[in-house]
């Protein structure tokens, strides 16, 4: 099977970029012809003119159409196209292009940009973080412009969501709910064995260092805790936070996936304190795989992944007091924590391995191709 993978990389390498790379490797390892068509914000948006041009064409990009025509001339048409992130360079114009070529389209809904107004800006009961430049006003404007041609979403054959929570949220916008399929993210299994939590020392945070990821709540909490915290990653708040003097916090910057996995493996527990809806955090999966306890905020799809005190620990999002309380519980109950880790480890091997995910992904592709032709 020939598969085109379409993705717009982010400025900071994150979970979506990782999923694209892992799915590509997975398909290639099963002898499929995979061609990645990647555009990159950091490379293509350097000048003022390029940024202005992108803003003008954010609803529909003729430049993207030209690029796709060149790629099809070079490689030929695919059997199926799998689209990940289209913002801001590709745009929904890619849907128009492949529909006219009669190619079935799979689209993974990694984030909530499509329904951002519903989830945050127009909902006073929810804490909201702008996805663009941390600005609500700019995010509202970009959301309006980006979704100006959301009529093109009707060309998508199947949408992949990661949990029942995300499927329900997107069903309010994508009225053809039969197009929404649940397929979680995955990681390749390792030969690691589970180490008792008592034998581990530090705590780890591995994510984008920005407000919506809960980094400020985490740091405020750790001021009053006698534990060492390793912070992995980059982001807009890194330089500001590093200026402060934290005796028990170390910053390690961006690391390779293997380095991140090694850190997680050696850590007592991973804290995932996000304060904005996540889709399916890869670092939580890594902790499951590495036999490391997860302490996460009880928000959005995280509650679909983690069952409190069964395969992880949940705390109230943005609540320093509750976070500290749950950390104290972990330290006081190592036996219970080891049982939780074992449950998560077994769940990973059953539900989130590459073998299981490949069977799910290829069935989605095959069904889409078969039904499209019929």
Specify the residue positions occupied by each region the protein language model found.
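Carbohydrate-associated surface elements
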Residues: 165, 186
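Conserved donor-binding/catalytic core segment of Leloir-type glycosyltransferases
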Residues: 187, 195-213, 219-223
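Short hydrophobic beta-strand element within catalytic cores of glycosyltransferases
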Residues: 293-296
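Nucleotide-activated donor-binding/catalytic signature segment of Leloir-type glycosyltransferases, i.e.
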Residues: 239-261
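Conserved acidic donor-binding segment of nucleotide-sugar-dependent glycosyltransferases
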Residues: 308-309, 313-320, 329-334
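Short acidic/histidine- and often glycine-rich active-site loop of Leloir-type glycosyltransferases
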Residues: 284, 299-309, 313-314
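Membrane-proximal helix-turn-helix segments that form the acceptor-binding/catalytic region
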Residues: 100, 125-159, 173
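A short, well-ordered alpha-helix in the C-terminal region of glycosyltransferases
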Residues: 322, 329, 336-351, 357-363
């Amino acid at each position: 099977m020939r598969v085109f993978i379409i993705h717009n990389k982010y400025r900071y390498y994150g979970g979506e970029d990782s999923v694209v790379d892992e799915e590509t490797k997975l398909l290639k390892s099963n002898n499929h012809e995979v061609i990645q068509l990647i555009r990159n914000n950091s490379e293509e948006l350097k000048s003022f003119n390029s940024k202005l041009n992108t803003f003008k064409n954010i609803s529909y990009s003729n430049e993207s159409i030209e690029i796709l025509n060149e790629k099809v001339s070079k490689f030929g048409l695919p059997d199926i196209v799998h689209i990940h992130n289209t913002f801001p360079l590709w745009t929904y114009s890619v849907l128009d292009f492949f529909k006219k070529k009669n190619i079935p389209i799979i689209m993974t809904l990694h984030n909530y940009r499509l329904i951002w107004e519903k989830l945050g800006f127009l909902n006073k009961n929810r804490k909201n973080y702008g996805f663009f430049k941390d600005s609500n006003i700019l995010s509202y404007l970009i959301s309006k412009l980006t979704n100006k041609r959301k009529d093109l979403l009707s060309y998508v054959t199947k949408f992949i969501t990661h949990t029942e929570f995300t499927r329900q949220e997107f069903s309010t916008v994508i009225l053809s709910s039969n197009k929404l399929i649940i397929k979680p993210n995955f990681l390749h299994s390792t030969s690691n064995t589970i180490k008792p939590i008592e034998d581990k020392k530090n705590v780890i945070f591995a994510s984008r260092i920005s407000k919506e990821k809960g980094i400020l709540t985490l740091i405020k909490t750790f001021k009053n805790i006698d534990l060492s915290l390793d912070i992995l990653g980059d982001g807009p708040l890194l330089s500001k936070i590093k200026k402060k003097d934290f005796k028990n916090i170390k910053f390690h910057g961006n690391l390779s996936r293997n380095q991140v996995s090694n850190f997680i493996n050696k850590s007592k527990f991973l804290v995932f304190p996000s304060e904005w809806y996540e889709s399916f955090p890869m670092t939580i999966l890594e902790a499951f795989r590495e036999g490391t306890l997860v302490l996460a905020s009880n928000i959005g799809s995280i509650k679909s992944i983690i069952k409190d005190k069964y395969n992880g620990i949940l705390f109230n999002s943005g609540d320093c007091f509750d976070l500290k309380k749950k950390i104290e519980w972990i330290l006081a109950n190592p036996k219970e924590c080891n049982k939780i880790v074992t449950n998560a480890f077994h769940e990973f091997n059953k539900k989130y391995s590459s073998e299981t995910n490949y069977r799910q992904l290829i069935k989605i592709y095959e069904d889409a191709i078969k039904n499209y032709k019929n």
